[in-house]
Structures are given as structure tokens and as C-alpha cells.
């Protein structure tokens, strides 16, 4: 539920205004002056809320909703209760997001946790650091020597920006984040508790496990978003690179020397081992593990909880443990299930009729 305690209320909108913004058709134009004050899910919506319907799993919620208006496809508009104004649109969820972004700009990026303006008195900023106009630094943040931070950026409480780091304009660094040995572009969102630029896990394994110096950097290009608790190791010799527009979920590990292409999507708890390469527009489901030194080609997709030990060609869908093309993986699963149902997979019987021992 949207709370005015956390998100500032925006001016109300008429249904005619919403239809124009979302490129929807208001089925009953006489309701064009009807006022909507917010958004909500169908089961929580009231008469002043806008909702949307797209998934048949939520038919019951639609039939019982108290929403004032609903975005819906032509195919499903007959399911909308008579008291709910109908906004016909090709993609209800996209239209809903368009309106949500319009009225809740404050929810698009993490802002100052203290609603601060300027630099908090308890922040520590080195004399050689250079901050452009409009930078916000929350309490107890530390900005090191030779750091550069662009206009409109926000540094959250308790964060540490180490010596020489460059952060572009309109960036947000969440509370309790550490950044070192990194160059960061514009409009980058780093959520709370991230650690970027620490050395990678690289040793010459012997009785004493000799540590290998990691002297590379982390390069984060424009419009990247990094979820809470994610760690990005700096490169050993070459840089760790996260490409433009890539979105990374919470608790992802990015190893040293990893190269992630543009506009990739990486879901929670993925582990990317050192020196691997993701092409552009790659999608990894949650808890995917990728082996070191492999390449996943442009546009490839990996199913959640898969383990990738071999390179994946561009545009293919792989899954499983170990990952393989999904059609092959599904065929193997079906074959095993058939064997089990037929009894072919049962343990052999010994001469006395008891199950044979398994070594």
C-alpha cells in the first residue's frame, strides 16, 4: 500500500488526463472529469485509485475491486465491474507504470535518508575532494582525497567514497556503501549496503596461499542500477566493467575482471566468477552461477538456479545443472520421469527378493 508517510502525495489527475498520458481509450468519455488521487493493487484499491488487470490469476480481485478506474485490454474489459471506469489499452502494465512514474518521481531513485540539502555537518570531506553544485552528502559519510562527485548526486549516510573515485552526475549512493578504485558514470543508482572496488579472490594456491595483487579498477557506465548488498570486485590486471543500462538485483557477486555488457538484467543472488564475459542484453535468473573465463553471448537467457560451466552462444536459452539448451534440458527431465514411472529406474532385486545394496 502506498503511504504518504514515505511517498509524497502528488496532485490528483482526471481520467481524461490519465488516458492522454497512457495513450488509453476511456470507454465512457462522460467520466473524463472523474478524479484519481493514486494507484493501488486491485484488492486494496478504493474509489480514488487506478488499478490494472492483465493476469487471469487475479480475476477474483478484479471482480471484487473497489477501484475507481482500471487499465485493461479489450479482451478482458467485459470482466470489469460496472462501477469501475474502463481505460482500454494494449499493455495495461506498461500504461500503469507510465502513470506510476508520473506521480511518484520520488520512488524512482533512493533519495537522502534525512531529506537533506547540501552537506551534513557530521560528514567528513577531504580538502582535495571536488563536489559540484547540488551534491547532497548525508550524515557520517566520508569522502576521501581527490574524489570527484557530479552535480545532483546523493551520498547516503555512513557511506565511504575512497581516494580517487569519480562519480558522475545525478547518481545515488545508498547508505553504508563503500566505493574504492572505481569510475562511475551518470545516473547510476547504487542501493544501500553495496561494496564496490575491493580486491578480488585471487591466490596462488599452495600451503601458504599467496595473494595476487589486484591492480585494476571498476568501471560502471551510465544508467546502471545495482541492488542492495551487491559486491563488485576490482580487476586484477584489466578492469571489471558493468555496461550502460545494466540492472543488477540484490546480493549479486561480480568477480574480478568480469565484463558485463549493455542492458543486461541480473536477478538476485547470482554469482559471476572472475574473468567471465556477458554480452549485451543478457538475462540471468535468480541464483545463477557462472564459471570463470566463459562467455555468454548477446541476448542469451539463463534459467534461475542454473550452473553455467561452458560458454553460451548468442541468443540461446540455457538452464539446468550443468546448464545446457533448455529444450534439451526439458527433454532429459521428461525422459527421466518416464523411466521412473515405468519402473526402469528401480533398484535391482537380489536373489532373496530384497533390494540390492547400493555401493
UniProtKB/Swiss-Prot annotation:
Pathway info: Bacterial outer membrane biogenesis; LPS lipid A biosynthesis
Any matching Pfam family: Hexapep_2
GO molecular function, one term: N-acyltransferase activity
Keyword match Signal: no
TM spans (from-to): none
Record's keyword annotation contains Repeat: yes
PROSITE patterns in UniProt: HEXAPEP_TRANSFERASES
SUPFAM superfamilies: Trimeric LpxA-like enzymes (SSF51161)
Main enzyme class: transferase
Example of a GO biological process term: lipid A biosynthetic process
Active site: 256
EC number of the protein: 2.3.1.191
Main function: Catalyzes the N-acylation of UDP-3-O-acylglucosamine using 3-hydroxyacyl-ACP as the acyl donor. Is involved in the biosynthesis of lipid A, a phosphorylated glycolipid that anchors the lipopolysaccharide to the outer membrane of the cell.
Family membership: Belongs to the transferase hexapeptide repeat family. LpxD subfamily.
Protein name: UDP-3-O-acylglucosamine N-acyltransferase
Organism encoding this protein: Rhodopseudomonas palustris (strain BisB5)
UniProt lineage: Bacteria, Pseudomonadati, Pseudomonadota, Alphaproteobacteria, Hyphomicrobiales
Gene name as annotated: lpxD
Amino acid at each position: 500500500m502506498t503511504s504518504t508517510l514515505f511517498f509524497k502525495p502528488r496532485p490528483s489527475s482526471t481520467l481524461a488526463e490519465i488516458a492522454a498520458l497512457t495513450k488509453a481509450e476511456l470507454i465512457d468519455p462522460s467520466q473524463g472529469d472523474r478524479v484519481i488521487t493514486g494507484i493501488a493493487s486491485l484488492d486494496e484499491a478504493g474509489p480514488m485509485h487506478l488499478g490494472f488487470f492483465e493476469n487471469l490469476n487475479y480475476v477474483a480481485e478484479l471482480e471484487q475491486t473497489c477501484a475507481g478506474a482500471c487499465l485493461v485490454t479489450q479482451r478482458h474489459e467485459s470482466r470489469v465491474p460496472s462501477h469501475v471506469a474502463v481505460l482500454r489499452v494494449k499493455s495495461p502494465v506498461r500504461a500503469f507504470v507510465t502513470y506510476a512514474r508520473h506521480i511518484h518521481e520520488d520512488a524512482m531513485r533512493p533519495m537522502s535518508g534525512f531529506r537533506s540539502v547540501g552537506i551534513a555537518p557530521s560528514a567528513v570531506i577531504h580538502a582535495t575532494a571536488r563536489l559540484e553544485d547540488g551534491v547532497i552528502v548525508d550524515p557520517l559519510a566520508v569522502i576521501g582525497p581527490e574524489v570527484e562527485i557530479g552535480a545532483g548526486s546523493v551520498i547516503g549516510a555512513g557511506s565511504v567514497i575512497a581516494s580517487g573515485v569519480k562519480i558522475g552526475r545525478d547518481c545515488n549512493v545508498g547508505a553504508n556503501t563503500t566505493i574504492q578504485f572505481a569510475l562511475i558514470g551518470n545516473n547510476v543508482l547504487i542501493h544501500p549496503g553495496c561494496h564496490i572496488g575491493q580486491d578480488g579472490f585471487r591466490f596462488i594456491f599452495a600451503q601458504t596461499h599467496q595473494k595476487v595483487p589486484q591492480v585494476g579498477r571498476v568501471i560502471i557506465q551510465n544508467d546502471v542500477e545495482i541492488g542492495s548488498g551487491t559486491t563488485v570486485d576490482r580487476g586484477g590486471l584489466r578492469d571489471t566493467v558493468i555496461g550502460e543500462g545494466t540492472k543488477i538485483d540484490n546480493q549479486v557477486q561480480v568477480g574480478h575482471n568480469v565484463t558485463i555488457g549493455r542492458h543486461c538484467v541480473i536477478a538476485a543472488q547470482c554469482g559471476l566468477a572472475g574473468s567471465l564475459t556477458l554480452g549485451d542484453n543478457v538475462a540471468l535468473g535468480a541464483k545463477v552461477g557462472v564459471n570463470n573465463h566463459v562467455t555468454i553471448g548477446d541476448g542469451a537467457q539463463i534459467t534461475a538456479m542454473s550452473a553455467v560451466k561452458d560458454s553460451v552462444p548468442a541468443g540461446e536459452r540455457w538452464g539446468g545443472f550443468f546448464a545446457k539448451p533448455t529444450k534439451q534440458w526439458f527433454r532429459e527431465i521428461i525422459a527421466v520421469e518416464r523411466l521412473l514411472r515405468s519402473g526402469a529406474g528401480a533398484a535391482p532385486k537380489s536373489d532373496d527378493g530384497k533390494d540390492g545394496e547400493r555401493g
